[in-house]
Amino acid sequence: VGLLLSNAGYDLVFADVADALIEGLQNSESYSVHEVGDDPRTTVVRGYSALNSAKQAAELTDAIARADVVTTAVGAHILKFVAPAIAAGIAARPAGAARVAVMACENAINGTDILKAEVERNYSGDDLADRALFANTAVDRIVPAQAADAGLDVTVENYFEWAIETPPFEG
C-alpha cells in the first residue's frame, strides 16, 4: 500500500513500535520494492518519514492530524492497539479541516469497521463523523516470504488490486 500511495503522490509517514524497523527507515533515504512475476521491476521509494509510535506519540498525533489518508497494515488483532493514536490524531485535526480517510488494509473482512469501533471507543468527542471517514478495503497483493537479509526492501508479486468501498466518500 505504501508503494501505491507513494506513486499517487502522497507523502508517507510510517509508524511502528519495532525499533529496528523504524531506525532503519529513519536512517535510510529509500527502500526498494521488487516486483516479481510476468513484468518484473524494482521501484525505489523515497521521500518518506518514520515514527516510533511508542516513543514519538506527539509527533504521530501531529502527523495524523495533518494527514489526508491513514492506512493500517498491522493485522486485525493489532487494530485495538493502534486505535488510540488514530483517535488522538483525529481529535487534533483543525476545526473545519477536510475529513481524513481511514482505511484498514488488513487480511480481514470489514477490517475498517473493526478499526472504526476501536477508534470510537477511544474518541471522546461527538464529531468523529465530521473529522474522519472510514472505508473498508480489500487489498490483493501477494507478498512472498522475505529473505532474512532483505533489510528494508520488500518483494511482492506485480499483480495487485486495492478495492475501496465508495459510499463513505459520497455526499
Residue ranges and their predicted role:
Residues 2-61, 66-67, 71-74, 78-171:
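Substrate/ligand-engaging "lid" and interaction regions
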